[in-house]
Amino acid sequence: MKAEVVSMTADNLDMEAIRRGGDILKQGGLVAFPTETVYGLGGDALNPQASMKIYAAKGRPSDNPLIVHIAEFDKLAPIVAEVPEKAKILAEKYWPGPLTMILPKSDLVPQETTGGLDSVAVRFPSDRIAQELIKAAGGYVAAPSANTSGRPSPTTAQHVEEDLGEAIEMIIDGGQVGIGLESTIVDFTEDVPVVLRPGYISLEMLQETLGDVRMDKGLIAADSKVRPKAPGMKYRHYAPKADLAIVEGPEEAVVKKINELAAEAKAHGEQVGIIATDETKDRYPEGLVVSIGSRKEEETIAHHLYEVLRDFDQSAVRSIYSEAFYTPRMGQAIMNRLLKAAGHKIIQV
């Protein structure tokens, strides 16, 4: 089976293709679609078999919960047991948008969708294509990122086709996504809201809105018997095919160390990949150097991260060295993804 690829934009929707995509989802099939964060792999969230198909297509462990996407505020109440007041405040401020909330689930949501948990992760995306597809599918679409599990998340339809083109029925090509990192996930099943995955909406923004919000300290669960409460917590994610390491420290020391590593590799007849910035890219004479953007524009760094990791897969490099990107607002989200991609391999200088 080869996926049908249909192209459209938010300003020029192909409603006939969206209707067909909705029918595929209603019948238990899978459709990949754009959101403002990354491309999602959609299945009917209320159909246990569809959720299991998502896990199979991605090669994803079935205890890794799926996010249920809605496109209307009144679709939230039927799938949750309750909505805490603080969750209502966040929904009013950030929905539709890159925010996922974990809430106690209702009996309407099958355990297959929630990874066996009694809670459900819910998001209302702002992308118009996503919204119309969700409505056409009946209102509830479970959708993790549309990539093979463990690989960098897809920011273009081409990325989806590379990973899942033979495993799903349809890919809706809406162009390159806007943000490029997955949504912020906030858990409301505890007394104090807890950020389980950082994203575009930062911890500081959440604290300004709600007051006491905490960052989960164990974003990767060490115990394989512990069920992750949110996508991305337990398993290695976002990884390129080459080994990736992050070089941390003062800029001068980082540049010097990466150049030493590149020279050493060259002496052995190998070329390394280097993830640099606009400010440092010309300081690396050896290696395949890619700039992720300027440190002055953190949204650009976030936007290009997965694209850069995937681009290295088209090269012959076996090792990649990246600078660290502790930027003011999105630094937590960027470094969360980069550290997971590197398997937490850090070289301190």
Describe the function of each predicted region.
Residues 1-349:
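Active-site-adjacent structural elements in enzyme catalytic cores
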